[in-house]
Amino acid sequence: MSLKKRYRETIQPKLQKDLSLTNIHEVPKVVKVTVNRGLGEAAANAKSLEASVNELAQITGQKVVVTRAKKAIAAFKIRQGMPIGCAVTLRGDRMYAFLERLINLALPRIRDFRGVSPKSFDGRGNYTLGVREQIIFPEISFDKIDAIRGMDITIVTTARSDEEGRALLREMGMPFQSN
């Protein structure tokens, strides 16, 4: 059963009961997933930017937006308009497919994985996790990568508090660390 179908049929009613909500539309849901990668030192290298864009496109199955510097910062050796990273925003079916792959395939492939930190919520029910290496995703083949690069994954929810967001992600199967 797909994650979207499971959310509608089992997770939503269970959360409504657990959080004692009167209306089904009050139940927290995932709005979007943003996958972001800052290039850092590699920003000057066009080849690493292209490799980054291609990897994110393979992982998410969607076109990648190159993020550019808003203003020049001499200390970081960047000029205005220089490419400094890339990002993808996933919504709808692609978002649920990505979350399912992340939870069931990618996270268990992390070395010495004991669960994701339950403290990475922002106070409004949104969750951010950092991934250190892109090879945990099955779409990326180890032989074709030129460098190990990480990424930030932000899961934006309609939850009003961290507890609601944590309950939603736990029901979806997110493996949180047990203290």
UniProtKB/Swiss-Prot annotation:
Domain of life the protein comes from: Bacteria
Signal peptide: none
GO cellular component, one term: ribosome
Keywords: Ribonucleoprotein, Ribosomal protein, RNA-binding, rRNA-binding, tRNA-binding
Keyword set includes Iron: no
One GO-annotated biological process of the protein: translation
Alphabetized Pfam families for the sequence: Ribosomal_L5 (PF00281), Ribosomal_L5_C (PF00673)
Record bears the keyword RNA-binding: yes
GO molecular function: rRNA binding; structural constituent of ribosome; tRNA binding
UniProt similarity note: Belongs to the universal ribosomal protein uL5 family.
PANTHER family (UniProt xref): 60S RIBOSOMAL PROTEIN L11-RELATED
Function: This is one of the proteins that bind and probably mediate the attachment of the 5S RNA into the large ribosomal subunit, where it forms part of the central protuberance. In the 70S ribosome it contacts protein S13 of the 30S subunit (bridge B1b), connecting the 2 subunits; this bridge is implicated in subunit movement. Contacts the P site tRNA; the 5S rRNA and some of its associated proteins might help stabilize positioning of ribosome-bound tRNAs.
Subunit text: Part of the 50S ribosomal subunit; part of the 5S rRNA/L5/L18/L25 subcomplex. Contacts the 5S rRNA and the P site tRNA. Forms a bridge to the 30S subunit in the 70S ribosome.
Name used for this protein in its record: Large ribosomal subunit protein uL5
Gene name tied to this protein: rplE
